[in-house]
């Protein structure tokens, strides 16, 4: 299944570029690269692996994330990316992912922060109730459009997942390769 998702990442990054005749080369993200960047997470929950310009003023990024055990009652801590769409591919573990619903007490990330300029684009965080809850586990794929609040209400142990980020405003740095894997 991971090979299929990596193939989808290659197709997403290659097809628009070929259609626009901007490039005839695909961008690969190998399992070895994912593992190498994952090993550097440390206290962070999110690291970018690569960002590629796919044409039509759009970048696509691939990041690796891991979150530890979590249990909430009522309000869920959430994030909203104003323009960036995310596609999660769950590698290990699982939990309850909640999407939608109104975001309350929103705090915007500083526009010059690494979170905005390297990882997720312009975004805010806050809490929300309601929305749609779904159980996710290894092998599942979830698409979260830009502007949709999302967060986990429960993670029994941990969850490790890839985030494929479609950045229509090219805020994320095209050509970025995580220094751990840069050749």
Say what each PLM segment does:
Residues 127-131:
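Short alpha-helix capping/helix-loop boundary micro-motifs
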Residues 134-156:
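Conserved metal-binding segment of the jelly-roll/cupin
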Residues 7-19:
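Bacterial N-terminal signal peptides
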Residues 79, 86-89, 133-134, 141-142:
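His/acidic/aromatic-lined binding-pocket segments of jelly-roll/cupin-type domains
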Residues 157-175:
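A short hydrophobic beta-strand segment most commonly corresponding to one strand
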Residues 1-5:
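Positively charged n-region of N-terminal signal peptides that target proteins for export
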């Amino acid at each position: 299944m991971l090979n299929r998702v990596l193939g989808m990442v290659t197709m997403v990054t290659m097809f628009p570029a070929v259609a626009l005749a901007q490039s005839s080369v695909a961008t690969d993200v190998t399992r070895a690269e994912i593992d190498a960047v994952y090993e550097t997470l440390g206290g962070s929950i999110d690291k970018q692996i690569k960002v590629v310009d796919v044409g039509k003023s759009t970048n696509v990024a691939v990041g690796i994330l891991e979150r530890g055990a979590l249990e909430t009652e009522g309000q869920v801590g959430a994030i909203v990316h104003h323009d960036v769409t995310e596609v999660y591919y769950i590698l290990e573990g699982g939990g309850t992912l909640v999407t939608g619903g109104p975001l309350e007490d929103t705090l915007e990330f500083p526009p010059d922060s690494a979170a905005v300029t390297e990882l997720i684009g312009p975004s805010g965080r806050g809490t929300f109730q309601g929305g749609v809850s779904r159980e996710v586990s290894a092998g599942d794929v979830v698409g979260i459009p830009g502007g949709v609040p999302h967060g986990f209400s429960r993670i029994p142990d941990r969850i490790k997942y890839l985030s494929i980020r479609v950045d229509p405003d090219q805020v994320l740095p095209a050509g970025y390769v995580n220094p751990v894997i840069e050749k």
